[in-house]
Structure formats: C-alpha cells, structure tokens
Amino acid sequence: MASAKKSVDIKNIRNFSIIAHIDHGKSTLADRFIQMCGGLQDREMQAQVLDSMELERERGITIKAASVTLYYTHPNGQEYQLNFIDTPGHVDFSYEVSRSLAACEGALLVVDAAQGVEAQSVANCYTAIEQGLEVLPILNKIDLPQAEPERVIHEIEEIIGIEATDAPTCSAKTGLGVEGVLERLVDVIPAPEGDRDAPLQALIIDSWFDNYLGVVSLVRIKQGRIRKGDKMLVKSTGQVHPVTSVGVFNPKHSETDILEAGEVGFVIAGIKDIFGAPVGDTITLSSTPEVKTLPGFKKVKPQVYAGLFPIDSSDFEPFREALQKLQINDSALFFEPESSDALGFGFRCGFLGMLHMEIVQERLEREYDLDLISSAPTVVYEALTKKGDTIYIDSPSKMPDASTVEDLREPIAECHILVPQEYLGNVMTLCIERRGVQKDMKFLGNQVSVTFEIPMAEVVMDFFDKLKSCSRGFASLDYNFVRFESSSLVKVDVLINGEKVDALAMICHRQDARHRGIALVEKMKDLIPRQMFDVAIQAAIGAQVIARSTVKAMRKNVLAKCYGGDVSRKKKLLAKQKEGKKRMKQVGSVEIPQEAFLAVLKVER
C-alpha cells in the first residue's frame, strides 16, 4: 500500500552520508537522527538500526550502504527532507563509501573526541572532497571524561585541512547536542540540483536480490520523476521493465506514489535477471532513451584471491547461484570456476582483503546454508616469461615453471599509518619486519603520520590485526595498490608421501620460504591422523626439499608372544612386519582432514 509521502520542495532536501572510522559512533548517531525525526517508535528502536545484516550487528561494523529518509522541522519553521546514506568505515569496504558519496551533496565527518583523527576517516574524507562534497566535521563522544575537543579540532585542521573551529559537538549515546548537529547540517550542506520536469535520469547506488520481488535498486534521482507503472529503461542493458513499486526507507520499507529529482529511494521493476540492473548504471524512461548516461563507479580490483569449495560436491550449483546473488549486492566480489585434485570443484574468488573474504564466506554459509572450505589466500603476482609475455598469477597452481620465467613481480601497497608518538617504534619495527620501505613521516601534534611501501601479500594477510595489537588499537591504516615490483618469489609445494597436494601450495618470498615451510610441516604433522604406515610430509621448492616431518605408523607389538626366546626369531618377526608396512605404503592413500587445509591459513609469520 502506498503511503502519502510529503511532497518537499527540492531546495528543502539534504542528501548526506556520515564518514567515520570504526567505533567512532557513526551508527549510534544515525540511530539518534532516526529517533529524533520520528522514523521509528521508541519500542521499535534497537541499536544499529541500519545495520540490518545479522553479521553487521554481531561484529558491530557496517558492511553495506543503507539509506533512510527522515523529515526534520528546523527552528526557522521549515520542514526538510533528510536522505541519509550510511557508509562502512573499515578499510576493506572503502569502495562502498565512494558509491554512497556519489549520491550526496554533503558528508558529516564524525570524529571521536577522545581518540582523534584516524587514517580511514582521512582517506574517506579526501574521497568526499574529490567528489565535490561539502564536509561538516562533528565531534562525538563529548560526554567521555577523556574527551579533548581542542586537541581533536587542531588535528582535524592539521591532518585533513578543513576548517573545524566551530565544529558542532555532541554525544550520540546520550543524545546531547544532536539537535544542534541537525541544525548545522541543514544550514551547511547544499540542496541538490535538478529539474523535476526534465526527462528522468537516475543513478543506481546499490542493488540487492529479493526472492519475491526480484532486483531491488536503491537510486538517486538526478532529473525528472518516476512513478509506479512507468516503463523504465536500464541504459547499459537496453531492457525496458514496468515499474511495480517505488518508495523510500524510513527506515522501514514504505511505498510511495512518486520519487522526484533530488530524492533517494528504491525502485522495484520485477527484474528477475540477477545482472538486470547493475550498480552504477543509469535509469531513464523508455520514452526518453536519448538521456545521457551518468558517470558510474570505477571497477574495484580484487587484491586477495582464494579458492572456495563446497564440502558436499552436490552443492556446486547452489553455490554458483549464491555467489551470483551476492555479486549483484557486492560489486567487488569476483569469481571463476576452479577444480582441485584435493578439494574437487569450486570457485576461485577475488576479495578486497581478509575481512571481506571472511564476511563473504560467512554470508554464504549463513544466508545460503552452504558448508565451504577455503584454500590459502594469495595476492596477484605478475610474471614476465622468456618469450616476453606478461601473465598474472592469482593461484599457486598457475605459477609457471621457474625455467620459463624471466622476472617475477609482486604487488606493492602504499600504506598510510596514523599512530600516537609513543607507539611509533613498535609500528616501525612491524613495517620493517614485513619488508616495508619508509617513504615519509610527519609529526602532527600528538600523532605521527608515516607512509611505508609494503608488499601487498604482507598487508592483506594479518597486518591490520598486528598493527592494532602493537599499538593497543590506536594506530589506523589506509592502503592502496601502487605498482608491481621485481622480487625473489618461490612456490612452496607440500608433498604427502611424495605426492603434491595442490590445495596446500603457497607462493612466498624466498627469505620466508624455509621458515614458513617448517612451520607448516610441523602443523600438518599434528593434524594428519596416524596411519598403518609412516607418512612423510615435505615442503619443497621445485625439487629441493626444505622441510620434512614424519607421522609415525601405528604398529602391533609382534614380539608380545615371544617372551624370552632367541633374538634371531624376534628379528625375523620385525623384518616380516616391516615388509608388510612397506607393501601397505605403496598402495595406501592418506585421507587429509579439513583442518589441515586451514593450517596453511594459520601459519604464523
């Protein structure tokens, strides 16, 4: 049923998003806005209203962009429509942020008044400024005894370079000062531009697949208007679909009669093809196909690749469908079919980082009820062959023979780290251990901004966790890929009883190979159950074995019946047993348990 949506003049609309580092109170501030503008009754309120995914609520992080439309009455008596688009704060989801910002005219930069500016907020803030948004800094958690507003204001001006002397202060938890934030927001952020009588032009910010409704698209109307019953044209596919419903989230799904220029809402047109309304595409009406296509979003390149395999091989098709449904909602996910001798059929998937990989795997297991196993994650390497061809390697099995390769290059990431001075030494040590090269260092008040170039393979695995633990959680990180650089890389194979197990192979730097080979072999020794014969576990680079360990055989005590007796009799029995074990070893195969594959992921540096 369509609810009567208030018609608001375009100059009274404000589209904004909130930029903040993890834990600086972004979702809590959003909750306060929703409560103060009457989006939900008090009994329906819950913490993190916009984080609808169970995973988001559990981990306390925002993964997906969400939108909500609120109505706010300003002290000057005018009513404003606020369209708030939520953005994630974690470094792995920065592409989601740029998508959300494309739909806004302004952004609130929320900074924790106790912790100060963090690297991720700086990166997202620059993205907003590049896209021409008006940025309004806000100091949150002002009620904490350790809050230092003057120092933080100085940091915002020093590090980010935006005016913050009269930044509003608030406490999203208690609601103190939030009214003032809403007032400033309306005054500072510009109204959207757009002609409501022009032909329809709308940008798809996000899409997701609903089993009953088909594709649901979150759109920002740039020009014109769209109603239920209109025939809409998706520019990239050229397909025309009748619009079955339009509406807004407030924050519940509520249908309306019309969406007009300047507004943000959802459009459902019964599209059953998963790729029927790609994110970043332009929608118009079938009567005006000549409307210009809006600039979309740049494709993000996956940084980490891993094989995902269903434990039950009959799940292969449901797994493919689940990945396709996830991909429409998560444009950074990449996948292609892959088969492994050890793990069967599955997909080689590309992710933005380890958190992204964990989240995708958990979403597949929870939302689609699949049991999955993953192979060791790896970054993309570049190889120059002796014939002069350049090939990209996203899996150890694709690594060409060393004799055919002229040069191997690994991806280098530029890491910007913000850290309080007292933890600088620990952070520098960590970066150097990870083969980092220092490029820049600036002292900004109590904080230090350091820039290192570190191989991507070192950054994406567990660098973020280690950085947090060596700085008691105060250091923050933002990284981006800069180039490929020649490096001494080797492929370490794992052999069990002389047979290579493809799913356990890994690519690493030559100086780490021996240490990681030994660690892996020792770990495997504990995980492979004892057999009736000796099992040799080896790590090798090419034909050279760098580590070995043996799982000893279980054996019967054949001397038990001898009591005293002649020593030659005992020797004969032992020799007979040995012969039997030897024969067994030739025909016996070793069942490798699932934990052994996960051991590769957990080999400490």
Swiss-Prot record:
SUPFAM superfamilies given in the database record: EF-G C-terminal domain-like, P-loop containing nucleoside triphosphate hydrolases
Record's keyword annotation contains Nucleotide-binding: yes
Domain called tr-type G: residue spans: 11-193
Keywords noted in UniProt: Cell inner membrane, Cell membrane, GTP-binding, Hydrolase, Membrane, Nucleotide-binding, Protein biosynthesis
EC number: 3.6.5.n1
GO molecular function: GTP binding; GTPase activity; guanosine tetraphosphate binding; ribosome binding; translation elongation factor activity
Membrane-spanning parts: none
UniProt-listed NCBIfam families: lepA, small_GTP
Role description: Required for accurate and efficient protein synthesis under certain stress conditions. May act as a fidelity factor of the translation reaction, by catalyzing a one-codon backward translocation of tRNAs on improperly translocated ribosomes. Back-translocation proceeds from a post-translocation (POST) complex to a pre-translocation (PRE) complex, thus giving elongation factor G a second chance to translocate the tRNAs correctly. Binds to ribosomes in a GTP-dependent manner.
UniProt name for this protein: Elongation factor 4
Species name: Acinetobacter baylyi (strain ATCC 33305 / BD413 / ADP1)
Organism taxonomic ancestry: Bacteria, Pseudomonadati, Pseudomonadota, Gammaproteobacteria, Moraxellales
Name of the coding gene: lepA
